[in-house]
Swiss-Prot record:
Main subcellular localisation: cytoplasm
Oligomer and partners: Binds ribosomal protein uS19.
Family of this protein: Belongs to the RimM family.
One GO MF term attached to the UniProt entry: ribosome binding
UniProt-recorded name of the protein: Ribosome maturation factor RimM
Signal peptide start-end: none
Gene field: rimM
Described function: An accessory protein needed during the final step in the assembly of 30S ribosomal subunit, possibly for assembly of the head region. Essential for efficient processing of 16S rRNA. May be needed both before and after RbfA during the maturation of 16S rRNA. It has affinity for free ribosomal 30S subunits but not for 70S ribosomes.
Lineage: Bacteria, Pseudomonadati, Myxococcota, Myxococcia, Myxococcales
Originating species: Myxococcus xanthus (strain DK1622)
One annotated GO biological process: ribosomal small subunit biogenesis
Protein's cellular compartments: Cytoplasm
Domain PRC barrel: 98-171
GO cellular component, one term: ribosome
Highest taxon listed in the record's lineage: Bacteria
Domains as described in the record: The PRC barrel domain binds ribosomal protein uS19.
Amino acid sequence: MTATSPYLELGYVARAHGLRGEVAIRALDPASETLDTVDRIWVRTRAGVEREMRLEALRPTPKEDIVVLEGVESRNDAEALVGAKVFVFREDLEPPAEGEFFQGDLVGLDAVDANGNALGRVEEIWTTGEVPNLVIRASGREELVVPFADEFVPTVDLEARRIVIHPPEYVEAGRKGAESGGGPEDAE
């Protein structure tokens, strides 16, 4: 979904929980507390059915949130939602501060280096450490994984749908080694 979409992808329904229709929603960002702040979500099932759903109750756990959704009354109802993508309404969220971005707005941006050379497109965001990592892919190129920090991502232009990347040295060293036929240890 684009930056102008009324929704931001939050995560997915990981599994049914219990017998009374609860579902476990796993956020793409494990540290996200967004679900605690909204009363409704937008759900897109694997079959492509989309609908708004109201949250009736939420119980956080270390890996996911256990949620009661309006109209989901049984385990069968809950199992029908497993694998569904979960979105939040942009209008229900506080706008990001100056220089900050919703992670979902970064996915789909074209990535270029400081000289404007195409590196690929931001396809995913991995949140495995203190800062998220942008996963940049392009046909015929190795995948780039770049920390989303000012040092490596000096410019984000949502209007132009473009992000400027300064890859970490180890990535550049690996690319030089690959171009010369050797591995990173052969790079200067």
